[in-house]
């Protein structure tokens, strides 16, 4: 294992993983020569989904609070080597939209449009998540993620909350063993 610039890299038998120390997530993951995660498709916290008719009471608030456009920044990190070849990467991550936005519906098409208001940058008082994230990398290449996520507006109803990432197309059939 080693740190190279803003990346922490580990290589083992049949696996290679890199973490982005500025975003607090995996930036590359290769098992047995197959790239599963590449830069741009890394796991990231998301709290937005496309609104539907039943969301009329809350959908504008999702956009106004920036849930559709979260950017992630590491506030602190620590890397700890543990017995048995395990390594834990601890991150405190702030997830927040860069600016205000609004949602409108085009009546003729029935489509929603999000308009970004770059003249109103978000600050500390605006909606954001703080995540305490722990990635554990095992010597056999297994990787686990634990996170504790909170926000400065705990009463805001969220559409969803979880981590998403994009797998290569050849992995279209898979089994998910998590909650939700």
Please report, for each region that a protein language model flagged, where it lies by residue:
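Beta-strand/loop-rich accessory regions of lumenal/periplasmic or secreted enzymes
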Residues: 1-180
